From Swiss-Prot:
Identification of the protein by name: CDP-diacylglycerol--glycerol-3-phosphate 3-phosphatidyltransferase
Compartments (UniProt record): Cell membrane
Family per similarity comment: Belongs to the CDP-alcohol phosphatidyltransferase class-I family.
GO cellular component terms, A-Z: plasma membrane
């Protein structure tokens, strides 16, 4: 249960409160000037930590497959860690008016729904592992959150709304992958009582 990939996933979860403290610290760390734009140092530090934590998603999966250490615990914990990290970041982005609340609500609602689906089916002995659309969704969310945490830099220097477009792509894949999880598991869900 506590093999290397699962320990990496647990480390990702442990980084979430540190990320939140950096982002929500009640003091001003100053701003970093980039051309005509600027970004709060706390947001830059938070973005770097978020990107590091997000990268562990790839690392734990790589080692799980390479070392043949894929476990049901890991199949459950890995997507949960992703959801916790991304949800914490999205809520903070809303607080700083860097993301529209309705988009964050759509993303987090889907995450709760799919987690609920996984929990119900786990009670019947079925494990709902991440599929390709779910993985694309996760990376789309990570890219969007990273770009938003960075205040759209460096794209802001050329007035290209990369962060906004990335968030729209993330919402799209969030909804589509959620639909796929439920449609593929609907029969199992109906017979789970």
């Amino acid at each position: 249960m506590f093999n290397l990939p699962n320990k990496i996933t647990l480390a990702r979860i442990a980084l979430i409160p540190i990320f939140m403290i950096i982002m929500l610290a009640p003091f001003d760390w100053g701003r970093l000037e980039v051309g005509d734009e600027s970004i709060p140092v706390a947001h830059l530090a938070g973005a770097i930590l978020f990107i590091i934590a997000s990268t562990t998603d790839w690392v734990d999966g790589y080692y799980a497959r390479k070392l043949n250490l894929v476990t049901n615990f890991g199949k459950f914990l890995d997507p949960l860690a992703d959801k916790l990290l991304v949800s914490a970041a999205l809520i903070i982005l809303v607080q700083f008016d860097l993301a529209p609340a309705w988009m964050v609500i759509v993303i987090i609602s889907r995450e709760f729904a799919v987690t609920g689906l996984r929990l119900v089916l786990a009670g019947t002995g079925e494990v709902v592992a991440a599929n390709m659309l779910g993985k694309i969704k996760t990376w789309a969310q990570i890219i969007a959150v990273s770009a938003l945490l960075l205040h759209n830099l460096p794209f802001e220097l050329v007035s290209f709304p990369f962060a906004d477009l990335a968030l729209w792509v993330a919402v799209f894949f969030t909804v589509v992958s959620g639909w796929e999880y439920f449609s593929k598991n609907w029969e199992a869900l109906k017979t789970s009582n």
